[in-house]
């Protein structure tokens, strides 16, 4: 533990000093360069595979599993939800450009009109409200999770394209970045502890994955057929370090996701995926 914290502090100073006044694009390029130096054999597009890139046997097993994905039945449920008309006869596809295809990579975005970050799940609930339906709970994986696992798959292959433009958007991005690097919980860890400073190491049997590429494949199916959204995963991670998580759909998580997604700009969307 002492070695882990020492290494964390060292790399934190290295990255933090250079990124203190960096623009979002400078942040992204700096992280990419950091990972390229650490893992010179990983091609950019392969970062969608996460920690699997660091374990050839696990990647081979994953590719075999994905020939017959264990979550197909739940994906079918999500498709049915997406295509079932609301009481007024309209569908989810009517709320989004191109019928919901090749557009999820634009989320989250900062909406100047309401002054806050809008996630894809928020857009789903906005669609429901506009059509006289009740909102779905952001942490309900049997509804919101399954629905978005399917609907985000309609954007597979689209490159992540998050924009941070304007003073208020930059402020939201910076708050998300601060949350990413803020240590919390009894273990005093941050998101960046595992996914930047200690990336590639093993912690509690888990091979730690790069933050680059995280945001392009959620929701994902973990431990078989349990669908998990990115923000639910945030809560799980904070609980793992014995901290108090924020609420799914909160400003803190939305802005964290904004930062987290921006650094994966240019990577292809791939939803859902299977992880152990």
Language model segments and positions:
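Bacterial N-terminal signal peptides that target proteins for export
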Residues: 1-8
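Residue-level detector of functional hotspots within protein domains
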Residues: 8, 48, 177
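Short, charged low-complexity linear segments at domain edges
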Residues: 61-80, 158-177
């Amino acid at each position: 533990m002492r070695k882990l914290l020492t290494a964390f502090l060292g790399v934190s100073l290295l990255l933090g000093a250079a990124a203190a006044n960096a623009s979002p694009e400078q942040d992204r390029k700096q992280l990419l360069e950091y990972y390229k130096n650490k893992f010179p054999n990983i091609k950019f597009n392969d970062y969608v595979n996460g920690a699997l890139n660091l374990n050839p046997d696990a990647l081979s097993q994953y590719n075999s599993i994905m020939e017959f994905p264990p979550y197909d039945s739940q994906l079918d449920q999500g498709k049915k939800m997406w295509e079932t008309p609301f009481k007024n006869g309209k569908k989810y596809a009517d709320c989004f450009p191109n019928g919901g295809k090749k557009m999820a990579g634009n989320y989250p975005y900062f909406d100047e009109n309401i002054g806050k970050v809008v996630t894809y799940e928020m857009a789903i609930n906005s669609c429901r409200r506009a059509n006289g339906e009740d909102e779905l709970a952001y942490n309900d994986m049997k509804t919101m999770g399954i629905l978005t696992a399917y609907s985000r798959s309609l954007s597979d292959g689209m490159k992540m394209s998050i924009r941070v433009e304007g003073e208020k958007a930059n402020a939201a991005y910076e708050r998300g970045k601060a949350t990413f690097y803020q240590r919390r919980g009894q273990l005093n860890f941050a998101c960046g502890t595992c996914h930047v400073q200690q990336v590639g190491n093993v912690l509690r049997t888990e091979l730690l994955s790069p933050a680059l590429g995280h945001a392009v494949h959620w929701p994902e199916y973990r431990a078989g057929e349990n669908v998990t959204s990115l923000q639910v995963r945030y809560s799980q991670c904070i609980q793992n370090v014995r901290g108090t998580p924020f609420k799914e759909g909160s400003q803190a998580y939305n802005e964290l996701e904004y930062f987290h997604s921006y650094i994966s700009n240019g990577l292809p969307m791939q939803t859902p995926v299977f992880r152990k």
